[in-house]
Amino acid sequence: MPSADGSSSARPNGTSSRSDQLAWYKSQYEQLEAELADFQASSRELEAELEKDIEASEKRERLLKEKVDSLKYEVEEWKVRLEFTTFIADDGPRANLSLPRQTKYKQSKAEGNSAQNTLQKEITTLRDANRTLQLKLRDIEVANDDYERQARHTTSSLEDLESKYNVAIERAVLLEEEMRAGEQEREKLRIENQRLRDELSDLKIETEIIHEKLRNAELQNSRRRKPISLRSPSTPQTPDLFNRSPASSIVSSPLFSTPTLKTSLMSATATPPSPPISESSSSLRKSMNAMPGFPLQKASASDSSFGSRSLHGSRTQKHNNHSRATSYAFTSNRPTPSVTNRPGLPKPKPKPNENTNKHNNNARSSGLPKSGSLYQIRGLIGKMQKLEERVQSAKSKLPPPSDSPSRTSSRSGSILGESPVASTITARRNSRKRLSGSSFSSSVRDGDSVPSYAPHSRPSFGARTQGDSRPSSRTSYSSHSSVSHSTHPSVTPSTRPESRQSRTKTPLGHYSTNPTTESRRPRSSLSNPSNQNGVVNGMAHIDEDEDLAMHMSLRARISEIRETRLPSISTPTGLKKRTPSGISGIPAPRTLRTSTGFDRLEGDMGPPERKSNITDLGETY
């Protein structure tokens, strides 16, 4: 193929050099080689395209062959059908020719019909199953709705029951609270009722005792009308009367073994009863008028009545407005329960007024009546026995004793043969516990010990120093009070030591017997030294605190009477004595706990006339 370049396209001639020829041939060779490569590439592409076309044509050919075959089969079938139809329509010798084709057609038709019937049956069965399942599903849904409705009803009923249950619980709690409050109120009412019954019974017994004492006093006043002559100052003292040394004053207690009735009668014979209070007070006035140096007292006949709160009117206490010391004046020479003295607290010296001077002048105007008759002693013993019978009959009417242990009181007054009734006891009730006790106080003058009683729940000792000139109580030692006054005319009066009527408190019942706690004891309820004006007559001037303490003391008397039901208990020996500071030789009260569980205080001191141990008369604890 000629080149576009003229120099190269021109074939070199023989005159041209070999290099030119060689270059021309090389260019020709390269050109032909490039054309060959292009041709080969184009031929390869063409070959690939042709192969693709061949494959596509072959595929089309196969499809067409299949179509041809199917069409041939259809043609054959149509031919058979056509022949069959023609055979049916035309009877002739041609039927024999189409018999094989007819058999094949029937066979295929039978197969088709059987398959169609089977499919129709399956369809019918499936439809029935579907309908049945739909019905079941509907029934299940209905049942599910019923269950849901029932569950809702059950839930609502449970909620209602829970609400009702909560309401019932709240109501039950409220009812329990109301029942508890009702029980507490009923218990309070029962306690109040029992307390009122006890107070009523106490008041009845106290009234009976006071009436009996009043009758005894009237009888003794009617019997003792002849006064005895006063003792002159030069008359020597009776050694038994003024022998009040600590050796002769023996502490007795209800815990010691009670002597027989014979011993009590002997003690009553040895200690004759004192004259009536009115006569002894008149003799005391006379003796005091005869002694100008003796301290004056507030005294009257009504002072010594059984409800008197003041036996020593000259010893007033300006600071004591609520006295609680119980004091009953008896009709014989029995030591009177008086206010106990505390040696540590001095009291202001009272100023005698015109009333005290007047009463003391009246006290000096009469003498002591005669006392010592065996007839009077026997009469007193008979009255004492009657009173004991009345106390026993009153005990049978009392309710049973409480469960809490109570403290008994010492009854040292009944050994002297005058009144069988023991000292009144001031009891403090703490809740349901009824606590009672007795206190002992001893007044010492010139080394002598004089027993006196104060109805407290703890014992204490009041000391009398050398200058203390308090005379003996008109109700306790009325037989020799004027003698002691006339024998000691030069005794200077001094202030009375601090007694239990000071503002001190006491532990209730059996909580403490420590002497350090005895100074906190409150006063008794009835005995009040007249610290405000004039003479206290009977129980007319008892204030509210004293009324309350009086009721407590009356209830304590019931406790004391109940304690008499217990068997007698002997006291163990070898007990230590407790002596307060500043006092020597005075028997101190001792606290003993017996096997019955009752805490008792012994501080009873025997009368100065006797040297032997003195215990209660006919009373066992």
Swiss-Prot record:
A biological process from GO: microtubule nucleation
Bias-annotated ranges (Basic and acidic residues): 599-613
GO CC annotations, alphabetized: cytoplasm; kinesin complex; kinetochore; microtubule
Positions of region (Disordered): 1-21, 218-372, 389-537, 569-621
Sequence ranges of Low complexity compositional bias: 264-288, 300-310, 353-362, 404-414, 469-496
Biased composition (Polar residues): 1-20, 231-263, 323-341
GO molecular function: microtubule binding
Subcellular location: Cytoplasm, Cytoskeleton
Coiled coil stretches, renumbered: 18-219
UniProt keyword list: Coiled coil, Cytoplasm, Cytoskeleton, Microtubule, Transport
Gene3D superfamilies recorded: 6.10.250.1080
Keyword Transmembrane helix listed: no
Superkingdom to which the source organism belongs: Eukaryota
Subunit note: Self-associates. Interacts with nudF.
Record function comment: Required for nuclear migration within hyphae during vegetative growth.
Family from the record: Belongs to the nudE family.
Protein name: Nuclear distribution protein nudE homolog 1
Species name: Aspergillus fumigatus (strain ATCC MYA-4609 / CBS 101355 / FGSC A1100 / Af293) (Neosartorya fumigata)
